[in-house]
């Protein structure tokens, strides 16, 4: 993302990239493991010990995508939690409904919310 400027344009691009990761095979494999773990105690125990490390690795990649201007924002931690949980929930519809992820109406919403949370003063809302 070296070619993407800082500020809202970078946030828009970061959200596009993060959203795309929720449509890749590794995410769907993880989702299937989580679902199976609900009724498989040994699998649940194994995932419980590994999940924090995976989450930390994913977060490190996300931090690199966002860049230092964004990761230093006071509401960055809250924004990441909001985006990850929201994207994880929204993507479930794609398990049974084929549609282009880039046109999902949530993408524009996430971009507007991110701009408001990260740049509350002096930056226009991103329109996505």
Each predicted region: which residue ranges?
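Hydrophobic alpha-helical connector segments
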Residues: 1-27, 73-83
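Residue-level signal for well-ordered alpha-helical positions
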Residues: 4, 49-50, 97
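Residues in soluble alpha-helical coiled-coils and helical-bundle/repeat scaffolds
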Residues: 2-6, 38, 42, 70
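Amphipathic alpha-helical packing segments from all-alpha helical-bundle domains
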Residues: 22-31, 41-67, 78, 108-112
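Hydrophobic/aromatic-rich alpha-helical bundle segments in the mid-to-C-terminal region
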Residues: 44-45, 65-128
